[in-house]
Amino acid sequence: MLAPDSVGRTFAGADSISITQSEIDAFAAVIGETDTTIAPPTFTIRISLDQFQNILTRPEVGLDWSRLVHGDQKFEIFSHVKAGDSLSCSATIESYRVAAGNEIVSVRSDLHRGEELVISSWSTLVVRA
């Protein structure tokens, strides 16, 4: 169960993430995108989910990742991601509730290129009862 004092906390990701053209090309091919001069908007969910797992499974946070399913996603894009970018990620646990025994957690992820905010994304994560 999520530790109640985790709500409202922001956690920094461990490392910067370097974006390669081959990663963009592979992701674009899977979703049928042909223009790979910039990363498709949903490309960054891979970064966010990796960071969420690292953050939310910390002992002081207490979420059981093995029972987690992804419920919803939205993005706010400020700048395009492209090959050669080095991005840092932070995640904020914005809300938490229990419904029918399931834990529902809303997490905002902010990706930065240096000091510039590139993308904010919000994920609703459900930890099954």
Residue spans for each PLM region:
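Hot-dog-fold acyl-thioester-processing enzymes
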Residues: 1-72
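HotDog/MaoC-like acyl-thioester-processing domains
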Residues: 2-3, 77-129
